[in-house]
Amino acid sequence: MNKNDIAIIGGGIIGTVIAREVVKQYPQASVSLIERQLCGAGSSFYSAGVNFPRGISERVREMSRYSHDYYQPFVDDGAPFYFLPMELVTGKAHWEETCSNYLPTAGFVLSESMNPLIYLSEDGGQVVLRGKGAHYADVFALIQKWLLALRSSVAVREGLRVTALHPRRGGYDIALSDNTVQAASQVILAPGPWLAEPAWRERIAGLGIRVKKIVAVHIASKPEPGAPLTIFHDEDAFLVPCHSRGHWLFSYTSQEWDVLPGETGPLQARDLAAARELLRRYAPALAGEIRDGRVFCDAYSPSREPVITRLDEHLIFAGGANGSGYRLAPAIAADVIHLLTQTAF
């Protein structure tokens, strides 16, 4: 049986950032990162990787600020970040209230759209605000970059499903799909949307977290250099120029709940139709170029704030990031470290 001080279950962006911070905080600890697929191949793989300074509450805005600052030093280190101009479309009657959901660093000012393909009718009752502080990332590539540096200090175990968590004196025995057992003093559960796994389903049921489908469509038109990220705040949607892939991406809010990660399936006609209907209000030319996209799911908390909590003295849950795993991962990891520092192990 292998014995670790800390075992992290889930190798998405949240689990990977937690691993980075654990190694920094506890350089002498034995640490493992366990992932049922390849690290980054779950929700992180499908993520648009969009980061902008927004939060539904003061807590989430602070988490957004922390994470934004965390990512900045990696810009000059070859991280797959792509910085973008940013604009916000919202109702004229409540634009000041809308801006309160964003950090002051966004610096929003009333403007015209920077995207010539965006059309707002004169009587539509909407305004455009220009801001700053946005980027998108290739989240899967970022995870691989960080894993390369982590492998010398973290035991990365990919392709292994956790089949059971057995409490033991001083920690947990983690049963794996290859019939091995790994012991750990502290277990950090960062499962993304895999909430229904028998190993932890009952342990987290009381958190009230549910899994919702996420849809983003691709638009077969190459963005011009300098094209902005456009946030449609009232619709909870955004349009991002994916320069690294040579197409636009439009993400909108799906309301299909209680899905399972293994059963989201491919895009359906209704997914594409819903995207076209919404985008046609603002950019009919782009709406007409929607042909394909991506679909997966993520975990959503009742409060729409990430959940970082101790389930017992040896088990921490970190998740329910509400589709913002990349945007908030560093702050989530910081909260995990805070919980760990309160425990001797």
Predicted regions span which residues?
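Helical element adjacent to the flavin cofactor pocket in flavoenzyme catalytic cores
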Residues: L129-S177, A190
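Active-site lid/adjacent beta-loop-alpha segment flanking the redox-cofactor pocket in flavoenzymes
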Residues: P225-L311
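Helix-loop-beta segment of a Rossmann-like dinucleotide-binding subdomain
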Residues: A79-V89, E112-A149, V259, E313-H314, ...
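Central helical "cap/lid" subdomain
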Residues: T180-P228, Q268, A285
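Glycine-rich FAD pyrophosphate-binding loop
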Residues: V23-S44
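C-terminal catalytic lobe of FAD-dependent flavoproteins
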Residues: A285-F345
